[in-house]
From Swiss-Prot:
NCBIfam families: nifT_nitrog (TIGR02934). The keyword Phosphoprotein does not apply. InterPro entries: NifT, NifT/FixU_barrel-like_dom_sf. The gene is nifT. The keyword rRNA processing does not apply. It comes from Azotobacter vinelandii. Keywords: Nitrogen fixation. GO terms for biological process: nitrogen fixation. It comes from the Bacteria. This is Protein NifT.
Amino acid sequence: MPSVMIRRNDEGQLTFYIAKKDQEEIVVSLEHDSPELWGGEVTLGDGSTYFIEPIPQPKLPITVRAKRAGEA
């Protein structure tokens, strides 16, 4: 379960950075994106999916733990 940093780039898109892999991808979908609930399943530009435990919408950038979707 890697730690990832999520932030907005200069174009206003969410980016998902995995330091362990030195990989940064654009977030193409986020399951929950409201002030009350933010997170859930995250789909990246390369097609991979991760899961972030839903929380109230945070200020960005934020570092969170994410797991590959489908992992137990």
